[in-house]
């Protein structure tokens, strides 16, 4: 876009220099004005001609030569001429033929078509030049970036002839022109040119008048109607104002209008620390450059720092949801890993249970084959217990009779006792043990589990020493009692000492 603007500005400046060097005669200007009026009165014919010229194009809006244009050789000619008619028409306009050969460019006017193919009479071009046509016979040519920003013209409103002003779309960019190649012209030169033409020719004002405003002041604050974006420090507005796009697809949508208006001068960027990583180089506007670099284009080159608020919030919500899903997946994976560990433990438990079942089966097989002999087998026949019945089958221990052990310790065999009980009409539930199996009665003068009776033996003295040591008496008293125990000799004295010791401990 910047290169296209530079190309338009350069062509316009060269046309102004050519007009200043060789002013156009009054007759030629009157004829040009008359032709322009005819074109304005018959817009349908002009649109049909331009449709034929742009047939076969790629769909982009292209300029069309109007009343005064430039041929390939640079000679101006009337619209609709062929290449061979340019010299004759140049003589009619009052321009010498030598100047036509020497000049490389001429005055060029553009027609802009909307996306439906209709010609637009008034349009703000890419180089910020507004051409308005109306019925009042007054046409104003305004130029300059700041002028377009400061103008009060509403781009979205129709002109006096009923044609709506729309965006002309994108145009091919010429790679042969750059912004640095554009030369500037002072506003005084343009006014001087118009003054010389009015004095030398004294032609009457017919049709429309060309009014050129003074050169724009770059230091003056811009107060555009709906600026797209404000600059920094000097508060320079960007090119153009907000225009609704008529394209349904393939066009970059316009930025929305900011609801907040600047209340004061912008913040200066001179105190920005050098360590800031996201501060980009900003090229300031200079009168020598003739144009400015759009801040929006710089932002686009930096990777798209301008996001729509709603789209940015939606992207953040999506990122948050994805992070939550990722966290849930991590939890599920950790639980699955714990399940895998439990699965391994369950498998090991199953193996242990199988081994235990095998061991139990082996023990059952051994127990079923082992035969336990009854005690007393093979005794002497003269032994009183020899009459006890012996299991002839030697059954396993599981099926052993629990009453067989009693027959070995009782005085009479079980069979004889059962027969005796049946003859007496009653059964005896109790049997008498043999004397060798009977316990002796407990003696009161001997030590037993019932009580301790001291005697002259060393065991009795050891028991008394243990009683003294385990008591809660003081150490001095324990040592005194140990000395007394060593001095006692008789059994009676030892018994009295034991009784005295138990009384002292029980206190």
From Swiss-Prot:
<dbReference type="GO" id="GO:0140693">
    <property type="term" value="F:molecular condensate scaffold activity"/>
</dbReference>
<feature type="compositionally biased region" description="Low complexity">
    <location>
        <begin position="260"/>
        <end position="270"/>
    </location>
</feature>
<comment type="similarity">
    <text>Belongs to the morbillivirus P protein family.</text>
</comment>
<comment type="function">
    <text>Essential cofactor of the RNA polymerase L that plays a central role in the transcription and replication by forming the polymerase complex with RNA polymerase L and recruiting L to the genomic N-RNA template for RNA synthesis. Also plays a central role in the encapsidation of nascent RNA chains by forming the encapsidation complex with the nucleocapsid protein N (N-P complex). Acts as a chaperone for newly synthesized free N protein, so-called N0, allowing encapsidation of nascent RNA chains during replication.</text>
</comment>
<dbReference type="Pfam" id="PF03210">
    <property type="entry name" value="Paramyx_P_V_C"/>
</dbReference>
<feature type="region of interest" description="Interaction with the L polymerase">
    <location>
        <begin position="361"/>
        <end position="377"/>
    </location>
</feature>
<feature type="region of interest" description="Interaction with the L polymerase">
    <location>
        <begin position="396"/>
        <end position="410"/>
    </location>
</feature>
<feature type="region of interest" description="X domain (XD)">
    <location>
        <begin position="457"/>
        <end position="507"/>
    </location>
</feature>
<protein>
    <recommendedName>
        <fullName>Phosphoprotein</fullName>
    </recommendedName>
</protein>
<dbReference type="InterPro" id="IPR004897">
    <property type="entry name" value="P/V_Pprotein_paramyxoviral"/>
</dbReference>
<keyword id="KW-0597">Phosphoprotein</keyword>
<feature type="region of interest" description="Interaction with the nucleocapsid (N-RNA)">
    <location>
        <begin position="459"/>
        <end position="507"/>
    </location>
</feature>
<feature type="modified residue" description="Phosphoserine">
    <location>
        <position position="86"/>
    </location>
</feature>
<dbReference type="InterPro" id="IPR028243">
    <property type="entry name" value="Paramyxo_P/V_N"/>
</dbReference>
<dbReference type="GO" id="GO:0019079">
    <property type="term" value="P:viral genome replication"/>
</dbReference>
<feature type="region of interest" description="Multimerization">
    <location>
        <begin position="304"/>
        <end position="376"/>
    </location>
</feature>
<dbReference type="GO" id="GO:0006351">
    <property type="term" value="P:DNA-templated transcription"/>
</dbReference>
<dbReference type="GO" id="GO:0003723">
    <property type="term" value="F:RNA binding"/>
</dbReference>
<feature type="compositionally biased region" description="Low complexity">
    <location>
        <begin position="134"/>
        <end position="145"/>
    </location>
</feature>
<dbReference type="GO" id="GO:0003968">
    <property type="term" value="F:RNA-directed RNA polymerase activity"/>
</dbReference>
<feature type="compositionally biased region" description="Acidic residues">
    <location>
        <begin position="146"/>
        <end position="160"/>
    </location>
</feature>
<comment type="subunit">
    <text>Homotetramer. Interacts (via multimerization domain and XD domain) with polymerase L; this interaction forms the polymerase L-P complex. Interacts (via N-terminus) with N0 (via Ncore); this interaction allows P to chaperon N0 to avoid N polymerization and non-specific RNA binding before encapsidation. Interacts (via C-terminus) with N-RNA template (via Ntail); this interaction maintains the P/L complex anchored to the nucleocapsid template during the sequential transcription. Interacts (via C-terminus) with protein C this interaction allows C to associate with the ribonucleocapsid.</text>
</comment>
<feature type="region of interest" description="Interaction with N0">
    <location>
        <begin position="1"/>
        <end position="48"/>
    </location>
</feature>
<feature type="region of interest" description="Disordered">
    <location>
        <begin position="201"/>
        <end position="231"/>
    </location>
</feature>
<feature type="modified residue" description="Phosphoserine">
    <location>
        <position position="151"/>
    </location>
</feature>
<dbReference type="Pfam" id="PF13825">
    <property type="entry name" value="Paramyxo_P_V_N"/>
</dbReference>
<dbReference type="InterPro" id="IPR016075">
    <property type="entry name" value="RNA_pol_Pprot-P_XD_paramyxovir"/>
</dbReference>
<dbReference type="GO" id="GO:0044183">
    <property type="term" value="F:protein folding chaperone"/>
</dbReference>
<feature type="region of interest" description="Disordered">
    <location>
        <begin position="250"/>
        <end position="273"/>
    </location>
</feature>
<feature type="region of interest" description="Disordered">
    <location>
        <begin position="41"/>
        <end position="99"/>
    </location>
</feature>
<keyword id="KW-0693">Viral RNA replication</keyword>
<feature type="region of interest" description="Disordered">
    <location>
        <begin position="134"/>
        <end position="163"/>
    </location>
</feature>
């Amino acid at each position: 876009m910047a290169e296209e603007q530079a190309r338009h500005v350069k062509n316009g400046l060269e046309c102004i220099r050519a007009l200043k060097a060789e002013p156009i005669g009054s007759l030629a200007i009157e004829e040009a004005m008359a032709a322009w009026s005819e074109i304005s009165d018959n817009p349908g014919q002009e649109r049909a001609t331009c449709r034929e010229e742009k047939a076969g194009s790629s769909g982009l809006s292209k300029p069309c030569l109007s009343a005064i244009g430039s041929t390939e050789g640079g000679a101006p000619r009337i619209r609709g001429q062929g290449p061979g008619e340019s010299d004759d028409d140049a003589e009619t306009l009052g321009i010498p033929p030598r100047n036509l050969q020497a000049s490389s460019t001429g005055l060029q006017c553009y027609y802009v078509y909307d996306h439906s193919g209709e010609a637009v009479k008034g349009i703000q071009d890419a180089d910020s030049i507004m051409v308005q046509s109306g019925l009042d016979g007054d046409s104003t040519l305004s130029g300059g970036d700041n002028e377009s920003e400061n103008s009060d013209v509403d781009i979205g409103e129709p002109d006096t002839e009923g044609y709506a002003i729309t965006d002309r779309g994108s145009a091919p960019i010429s790679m042969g022109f750059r912004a640095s190649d554009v030369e500037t012209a002072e506003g005084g030169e343009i006014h001087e040119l118009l003054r010389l033409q009015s004095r030398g020719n004294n032609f009457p004002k017919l049709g429309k008048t060309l009014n050129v405003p003074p050169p724009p002041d770059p230091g003056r604050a811009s107060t555009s109607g709906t600026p797209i974006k404000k600059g920094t420090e000097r508060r320079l507005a960007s090119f153009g104002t907000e225009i609704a796009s008529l394209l349904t697809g393939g066009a970059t949508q316009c930025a929305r209008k900011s609801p907040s208006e600047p209340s004061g001068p912008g913040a200066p960027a001179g105190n920005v620390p050098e360590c800031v990583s996201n501060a980009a180089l900003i090229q300031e506007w200079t009168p020598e450059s003739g144009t400015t670099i759009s801040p929006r284009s710089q932002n686009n080159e930096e990777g798209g720092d301008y996001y729509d608020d709603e789209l940015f919030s939606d992207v953040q919500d999506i990122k948050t949801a994805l992070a939550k899903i990722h966290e849930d997946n991590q939890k599920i994976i950790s639980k699955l890993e714990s399940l895998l560990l439990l699965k391994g433990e369950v498998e090991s438990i199953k193996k242990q249970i199988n081994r235990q079942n095998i061991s139990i089966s082996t023990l059952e097989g051994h127990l079923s084959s082992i035969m336990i002999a009854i005690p007393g087998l093979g005794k002497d026949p003269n032994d009183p217990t020899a009459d006890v019945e012996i299991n002839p089958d030697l059954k396993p221990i599981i099926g052993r009779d629990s009453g067989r052990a009693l027959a070995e310790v009782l005085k009479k065999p079980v069979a004889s006792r059962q027969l005796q009980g049946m003859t007496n009409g009653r059964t005896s539930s109790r049997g008498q043990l043999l004397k060798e199996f009977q316990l002796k009665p407990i003696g009161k003068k001997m030590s037993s589990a019932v009580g301790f009776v001291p005697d002259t033996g060393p065991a009795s003295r050891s028991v008394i020493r243990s009683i003294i040591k385990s008591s809660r008496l003081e150490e001095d008293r324990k040592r005194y009692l140990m000395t007394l125990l060593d001095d006692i000799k008789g059994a009676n004295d030892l018994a009295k000492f034991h009784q005295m010791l138990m009384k002292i401990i029980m206190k």
